[in-house]
Amino acid sequence: MPDVKKFEAGTYDVIVVGAGHAGCEAALAAARMGQKTLLLTISLEMLAFMPCNPSLGGPAKGIVVREIDALGGEMGKNIDRTYIQMRMLNTGKGPAVRALRAQADKAAYHRSMKHVIENTPNLDLRQGLATEVLVENGQAVGIVAATGAMYRAKSVVLTAGTSSRGKIIIGELMYSSGPNNSLPSIKLSENLEQLGFKLRRFKTGTPPRVNGNTIDFDKTEEQPGDKTPNHFSFTTPDSVYLKDQLSCWMTYTNATTHQIIRDNLDRAPMFSGVIKGVGPRYCPSIEDKIVRFADKPRHQLFLEPEGRDTSEYYVGDFSTSMPEEIQLKMLHSVAGLEHAELMRAGYAIEYDVIEPWQLKATLETKVVDNLFTAGQMNGTSGYEEAAGQGIMAGINAALRAQGKGPFTLKRSDAYIGVMIDDLVTKGTNEPYRLLTSRAEYRLLLRHDNADLRLKPMGHELGLISDERYAEFLAKRQAIETELNRLNTTRLKPKDVNPWLEAHHYAPLKDGVLASDFLKRPEIDYQTMAQFLPDNPTLDHRVIEQVEIQIKYAGYIAKEEASVAKLKRLEGKKIPLRINYAAINGLATEARQKLVKIQPETIAQASRISGVNPADVAILSVYIEQGRISKVAQ
């Protein structure tokens, strides 16, 4: 077969390869920052596609969607336009773990995002298969497509997802493919290896889809959406609220299901040695669950509609790569699915990922300058994690094209910052999923305050309009004004005690500040406000902030003190060309890890596995005593 002739096809400031959730956010960020941007995708039909669960949000992940929105991204707005169910999770728990989750109409989500991208100034959308990164003098200068088209750029962002040398596995059947039977990206992986990148294989999977018309919902438990307005985007008004929401449904596996799986483990690629890639710890296949948790009599499953105009239902928590005939037997053993028609078989997919320790905190690679990577190819799982990386890579690619300095988020700024720091500092041996437990400062990184944390940064970057920023400033001022009022207004026992005694609470002996009264667990803002004169009319989001900031003031202060200590360590930069071999006293493992990771700050060095406090102290002393000139030679 003759070589495809190459030709010059255009010049851009930023090129983004891949139009999944990472690629869409990266391209939109770069274009909105005024950079001429190309978004290249294997298939226009796969743009912002949801090949697995048709939902967004949940613990930690839902907060990431809010953070993307606060920075000026699109994911939150797009799901608000296209959801079919919205629920706030963990409402009985504290604000640090509350999280919004939306069921998406996956076809509408794709169409809506495609419409936004097609109508964004500075942004060209094109179908094509990238095969090579053009590199000159160690810098990315463009990409080559399979057709021979060469696109030049000042910076390049790769978001290839699970297409990178993708291989789908269903029982004994294996074939080269991207997700949902899209084209795989094979040559790009080979090119990255030639450039010196270290790749590894990961695996993920998806459950079967069944025809909702053949489900007996009477045998399942209904999970309706919330009856009060909730939104991912801070710009979506409460008046835009879907009242006609679609329910999800819950059912369970049983002893028969488990026996079918056990009887056919010899045909399960997970256990026959066919699958080599490492799968996600927090989203195991159903056959893996049955083996690992053999004592469990049942596992819950969620039946989730894939959209308003389709009968397809996603069988959540039933991911499998079993042969199709076994999948049918498994499904038909489940209550409500006895006669379910299989519309799509579940499958596993293996794919290439870049070892993320080869990345900087900006998501620029250490191997090739001006080349950024984001999304699942960095070793993460999940649409939200991908989109969070995408907006950061797009911002930094645009800043690099403009000749400006980098933009990063610290662990105390955002869950996005936690994720990126985990990836570039620790790497990952399995598909990485964000969890609230990964964040040290989760009381500061809440669902409700993402705009207070990040919107000023988004405005400074040019991603938040002056109009939206003015609305934000008004909200922030209203919060500060009300906090000041409650911190300076006293309540008298004679006004409050009748209510307290009527509700069987201990009465007050002395006057108390309104803010201290609000700290009592039995008191909420509305209860307290009835004892105050001249209450202002406040938006419920302002009231929510006031109540959280007062009730959790002590805990918030403790976390802020920890953040201040961390910032001092983050301020201690490690020179780029430091020679760790010249530093006496470092443990061998610590020296090897420091050479491999190349941390940018003392704080980052302290988080590397294998680098102990003594090593950090030695490194700090060398830098502080000015011996860096010696060790950098």
From Swiss-Prot:
GO terms for cellular component: cytosol. PROSITE patterns: GIDA_1, GIDA_2. InterPro entries: FAD/NAD-bd_sf, GIDA_C_N, MnmG, MnmG-rel, MnmG-rel_CS, MnmG_C, MnmG_C_subdom, MnmG_C_subdom_sf. GO terms for biological process: tRNA methylation; tRNA wobble uridine modification. GO terms for molecular function: flavin adenine dinucleotide binding. Coiled coil: none annotated. Its main location: cytoplasm. PANTHER family: GLUCOSE INHIBITED DIVISION PROTEIN A (PTHR11806), PROTEIN MTO1 HOMOLOG, MITOCHONDRIAL (PTHR11806:SF0). NAD-binding protein involved in the addition of a carboxymethylaminomethyl (cmnm) group at the wobble position (U34) of certain tRNAs, forming tRNA-cmnm(5)s(2)U34. This is tRNA uridine 5-carboxymethylaminomethyl modification enzyme MnmG. The gene is mnmG.
